[in-house]
């Protein structure tokens, strides 16, 4: 009985880890986010209130472009070949605390790599540099 319970706990933890490191699989945008993603324009603006998902929407879009894994509902621009892209913020702090966190996970926690919008299986390597963070 204890072995079964321990095994069930082990399986539950592994499922939780897999879900946490593949947020792309579970992204279900709100209508305003989907409208933004599907807009076919060279320049777009997502303007909304505080803490409603603007940064994560942008991170998800970057993750789709960086990985080439577009969801079925996607009507926006699709890249058919690998891309090189830069993501930045107005300061080192916002780049680290917002952009990096939303893309690859909590910057000060190496075990959180892959808990952002880019799935862990798609992150080959990360390199920490003062003021800059690279991922491949």
Placement of each model-derived feature along the sequence:
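Phosphate/NTP-binding elements of NTP-utilizing enzymes
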Residues: 1-136
């Amino acid at each position: 009985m204890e072995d079964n319970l321990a095994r069930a706990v082990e399986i539950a933890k592994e499922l939780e880890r897999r879900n946490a490191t593949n947020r792309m699989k579970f992204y279900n945008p709100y209508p305003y986010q989907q409208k933004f993603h599907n807009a076919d324009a060279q320049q777009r603006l997502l303007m909304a209130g505080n803490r409603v998902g603007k940064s994560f929407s942008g991170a998800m879009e970057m993750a789709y472009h960086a990985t080439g894994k577009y969801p079925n509902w996607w009507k926006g621009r699709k890249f058919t070949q690998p891309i090189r892209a830069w993501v930045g913020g107005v300061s080192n702090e916002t780049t680290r605390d917002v952009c990096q966190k939303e893309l690859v996970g909590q910057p000060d926690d190496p075990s959180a790599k892959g808990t952002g919008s880019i799935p862990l299986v798609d992150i080959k390597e990360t390199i920490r540099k003062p003021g800059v963070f690279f991922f491949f």
